[in-house]
C-alpha cells in the first residue's frame, strides 16, 4: 500500500530515527510535535483565508496531551457524544464544542448542554 503522506517521518530530527526509538519493544504512538504544529498552522491559515471554522475531530484524534498544539489555530472540537464533549470543553477551555450524534441519550442530554456550543440533529425526531 502506498503512503499518502509523502513527508519523511521524524521531520523534527531531520528524518533520522532517534536511537532511543529503534529498540522499542511495545506498540506505541510516536508523535512528531513539529509536524503537528505545522499541520495545525496550515489548518489555521485555511480557516483564516476562507472564513470557515476548523474543528478537531476527537473521534479520530483524542490524544488530549496534544491539544495545546492545535488550540491556537482551531475554533474548537467536534464530539460524538457526552464524554467527547466534556473532553473538548475541559481540554480546550474557551473554544467551541460541536456535537453530532446519530442518537442522543435522554439521560445525558442535560449534561451535554453544559458543554456543547452547537448540536446537530439528524432529524426532527431527535428534537
What name fits each language-model region?
Residues 36-39, 43:
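Alpha-helical packing segments of well-folded alpha/beta enzyme cores
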Residues 17-18, 39, 68:
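Glycine-rich phosphate-binding segment of PLP-dependent enzymes
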Residues 27-33, 98:
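Active-site mouth loops of central-metabolism enzymes
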Residues 12-16, 42, 48-62:
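N-terminal glycine-rich anion-binding loops that anchor highly charged ligand groups
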Residues 52-126:
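Active-site-proximal beta-alpha core segment in soluble small-molecule metabolic enzymes
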Residues 36, 126-127:
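Adenylate-forming
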Residues 12-29:
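Generic N-terminal amphipathic, Lys/Arg-enriched alpha-helix
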Residues 2-16:
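Acidic, low-complexity proline/glycine-rich segments
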Amino acid at each position: 500500500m502506498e503512503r499518502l503522506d509523502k513527508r519523511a517521518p521524524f521531520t523534527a530530527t531531520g528524518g533520522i530515527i532517534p536511537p532511543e526509538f529503534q529498540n522499542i519493544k511495545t506498540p506505541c504512538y510516536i508523535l512528531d510535535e513539529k509536524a503537528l504544529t505545522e499541520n495545525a498552522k496550515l489548518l489555521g491559515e485555511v480557516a483564516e483565508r476562507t472564513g470557515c471554522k476548523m474543528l478537531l475531530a476527537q473521534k479520530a484524534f483524542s490524544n488530549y496531551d496534544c491539544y495545546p498544539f492545535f488550540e491556537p489555530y482551531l475554533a474548537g472540537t467536534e464530539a460524538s457524544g457526552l464524554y467527547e464533549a466534556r473532553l473538548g470543553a475541559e481540554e480546550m477551555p474557551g473554544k467551541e464544542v460541536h456535537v453530532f450524534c446519530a442518537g442522543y441519550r435522554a439521560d445525558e442530554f442535560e449534561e451535554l448542554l453544559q458543554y456543547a456550543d452547537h448540536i446537530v440533529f439528524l432529524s426532527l425526531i431527535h428534537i
